[in-house]
Amino acid sequence: MRKFIVTLFLILYPSISIAHMAHYNKYNKLEMEIFRNGELIGYNYYFFKRKGDQTLVTNQIKFSVKLLGAVVFQVESYGEEKYLKDQLISYNSKTLQNNKEKFVNLLFNSNTKKFEIKGSSFNGETSIDSIVGNWWNHKILQADSQISPISGSIKKQTVTFIGKKK
């Protein structure tokens, strides 16, 4: 029985880090509008390009928050996620957040089976169970940690589902 459980774990474990790219095969673009207090303040676009087993997901985001007419928070960012089959193999982003430059350069190390990250807030390795925190990928809701798409920092998270849509 123990051998069966270990074998089952080894078969299922690699599937934790995959993005299920097939779920997005029919999409070439996802557009999200960003609202604050009912007012449109920006956008978040995802573009999907496929070539064989490779998928490139490009992300563009821009928004600004104003308070009493003054800009108090502003983000403009561009990022690229590259997948081979369902495995994220690289992620790169450049962001201007409140006039500060931030970045992430992530590579999948196939030898160690970890992500190597050079970012404006984090340099090091992390588990492939961590998900880049871009909202097109539903796996973000199942992960115990996410990689900031702006700075590369690792953020622990707990997601609690409060009910099913009826």
Task: Label every model-predicted segment.
Residues 17-78, 93-100, 152-165:
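N-terminal cleavable signal peptides for secretion/export
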Residues 25-27, 92-166:
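Solvent-exposed helix/loop surface patches that form functional interfaces
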Residues 77-89:
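A conserved amphipathic terminal alpha-helix motif
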Residues 4-13:
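Sec-dependent N-terminal signal peptides
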Residues 47-52, 83-85, 108:
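Short, low-complexity Ser/Thr-rich regulatory SLiMs
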